[in-house]
Amino acid sequence: MARCGVAVLVLILLACVAAAAAAGGGDHHHRRGSRASARLQLVPAAPGASLAERARDDRHRHAYISTRLASSSRRRAAETSTAPGPEASAFAMPLTSGAYTGTGQYFVRFRVGTPAQPFVLVADTGSDLTWVKCRGASSPSAASPSGSPRVFRPADSKSWAPFPCSSDTCKSYVPFSLANCSAGTAPCSYDYRYKDNSSARGVVGTDAATIALSGSNGGGADRKAKLQEVVLGCTTSYDGQSFQASDGVLSLGNSNISFAARAAARFGGRFSYCLVDHLAPRNTSSYLTFGPDASNGASSSRTPLLLDALVAPFYAVTVDAVSVAGEALDIPAEVWDVKRNGGAILDSGTSLTILATPAYKAVVAALSKQLAGVPRVTMDPFEYCYNWTATGTPPAVPRLEVRFAGSARLQPPTKSYVIDAAPGVKCIGLQEGGWPGVSVIGNILQQEHLWEFDLANRWLRFKESRCAQ
């Protein structure tokens, strides 16, 4: 397909992320060790729904994020991680993309159970519970990204161990677990309700994930290993469109029951990912890595990563300033203060970046001022769209820069915020999130950068990268 067509589709897809994101974990009620690293191959999200639907779904996800951050009763994180395993080299899991399924998510291939059963899950930094569709799941039967329906069969797994509903883990740590417990030995149940009216219901326990370890020196063949006691939800009933494009969710959220915490505990206390251009073809891939990433060296910028309960299960950062064309914008400081009902989070499950109203108005006004000479067109859901071919010469796009605490500067490529919406049409690809409210840096703005979440030392590192293998 011509790049123009891909642009249309994938940016058309821009509106659907949060639903997919929700399926991926955004609207989910989900919520250290050897010098090894784990790689999960990521592939770009694909086009499918309309741009308006993508934007709508992102708004649903933003509402979910806001609701969780506003909650006054936050569950404690479960200390489910075990001691680091024996010295192992890199941990690599093959991943695939959600691009060809019509979602805006990045998918990972995940193997769980004994014997291992393969699944395609959404890699989601906003989720704290990994879950898969289970046998007996009641919902419209849809093909998984692999081409055929996949369901987890806990009865076939020798390593599956459900949590009793009477256990402290169920009552205190599992997000959105059900309070009813008629028999103490009954399995721990959950009922997730999403902002787009989707839901997922099932039981939770632990199982073993199969990972591929490779030598730390880069040599030698990969060898299989088991990551034990991974917290896993077995979803037996689900409703809505959010779950049609994947087999479930791989939780990368800020929670000790998430897969990210479990894997990072064994592989260096950190994980990283690099999102390729969201318009990249299906055969272009990147990686989700557990453990130190050699490619993220001295050239990286870094800023403190906020991991306290106030923002869990999300990853927050402090924004010091935003500038357009080298000019700092007048945005009130409280907009970036998570303790004052503001703040900013980095979210792989949201596609379009959503800014709190004061920041949105300032950024869009500055960008549109610089583009005043380009003919405007109307295209929902965006406020500013342009006929990009009207002048004959492609207009110059002003540089957007986000400066984080510690003087770390993010300068995303212009295609990450002035996006392709239709043939010959570009839009300022940002959404207004209201105020008070949190701002969300979506996966489009994150593309073509390597992001490392150093959980052990509470740093977020990033640098520009093409990401492709």
Protein language model features and the residues they cover:
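Aspartic protease catalytic domain
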Residues: 2-50, 113-115, 123-128, 139, ...
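Charged, flexible boundary elements
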Residues: 79-110, 314-333
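Signature of the N-terminal lobe/flap region of pepsin-like aspartyl proteases
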Residues: 89-92, 97-230, 236-238, 243-245
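Aspartic protease core domain of the pepsin/retropepsin superfamily
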Residues: 187, 197-314, 425-469
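Charged, amphipathic alpha-helical segments
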Residues: 186-195, 256-258, 270, 378-390
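Cytochrome P450 catalytic domain signature, combining two hallmark sequence patches
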Residues: 138-168, 269, 301-305, 362-380
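N-terminal zymogen propeptides
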Residues: 2-101, 156, 160, 208
